[in-house]
């Protein structure tokens, strides 16, 4: 074989490999750009809204657990601190909302309530803050970083979950009315089985997230709003418990009324306009 032909074949192979690498890099770059922009569209919540935040949540996607499975709670239900505070729950009608692929922020993609329902939901949280004013107050969310949360006044005196969450018990995502709440294992099982929410995909995976950190779907009507009020009350009862209660033996601390009641609130932002960043 002529020497020039012998060298031509490796050069062709190297050129082909280089072109293939360029094509793959271009496709990967295009996918990354689309994925990054779609993630930004969810709004802020827990991570910085920049490439660093996207890289973190992209890595955490690999660690997500099944958000609907309740087997994780089976071993906990009969242990101290896992008692039920909820009564029987009716099943939520219709399919569950579609949930975005990224674990942070944890958001849904459809079934959004109207502004009137979001306002009514804020009133439910306001009422809970007043009812349990001796035990909880409104404070900047430890998890979301940008909006308010129902938080224990003294996390050290509450359930071990409260110490893990810095006292945070529940918060609303102002853009769509979805929520996160922390329940007992028994109540988390009931909420998931009845279709009212799902487990955060990193709950129990990351050490700072209790395994019963649950995403609660936003209410669509008055009947569902009443269910959410029950869920919120159960979450507060769980977090203010001593951690030694067992099924049928609730030993949570009753809230003490303050001497001078104060108006507390968890006000959300109005729905964002297209392209606007939200929590």
Which residues are covered by each model-predicted region?
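Charge-dense, helix-prone N-terminal extensions
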Residues: 2-279
């Amino acid at each position: 074989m002529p020497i020039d032909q012998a060298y031509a074949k490796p050069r062709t192979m190297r050129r082909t490999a280089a072109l293939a690498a360029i094509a793959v890099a271009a496709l990967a770059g295009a996918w990354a750009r689309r994925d990054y922009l779609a993630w930004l569209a969810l709004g802020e919540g827990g991570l910085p809204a920049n490439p660093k935040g996207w890289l973190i949540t992209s890595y955490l996607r690999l660690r997500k657990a099944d958000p609907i499975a309740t087997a994780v709670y089976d071993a906990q239900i009969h242990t101290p601190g896992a008692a039920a505070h909820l009564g029987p729950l009716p099943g939520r009608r219709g399919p569950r909302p579609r949930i975005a692929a990224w674990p942070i922020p944890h958001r849904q993609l459809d079934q959004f309530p109207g502004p009137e329902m979001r306002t009514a939901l804020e009133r439910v949280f306001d009422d809970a803050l007043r009812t349990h004013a001796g035990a909880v107050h409104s404070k900047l969310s430890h998890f979301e970083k940008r909006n308010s949360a129902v938080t224990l006044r003294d996390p050290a005196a509450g359930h071990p979950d409260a110490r893990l969450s810095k006292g945070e018990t529940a918060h609303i995502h102002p853009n769509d009315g979805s929520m996160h709440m922390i329940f007992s294992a028994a109540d988390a099982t009931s909420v998931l089985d009845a279709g009212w929410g799902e487990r955060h995909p990193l709950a129990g995976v990351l050490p700072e997230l209790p395994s019963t950190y649950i995403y609660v779907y936003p209410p669509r009507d008055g009947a569902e709003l009443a269910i959410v009020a029950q869920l919120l009350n159960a979450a507060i009862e769980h977090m203010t418990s001593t951690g030694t209660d067992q099924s049928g033996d609730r030993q949570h601390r009753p809230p003490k009324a303050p001497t001078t009641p104060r108006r507390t609130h968890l006000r959300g932002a109005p729905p964002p306009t297209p392209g606007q960043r939200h929590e």
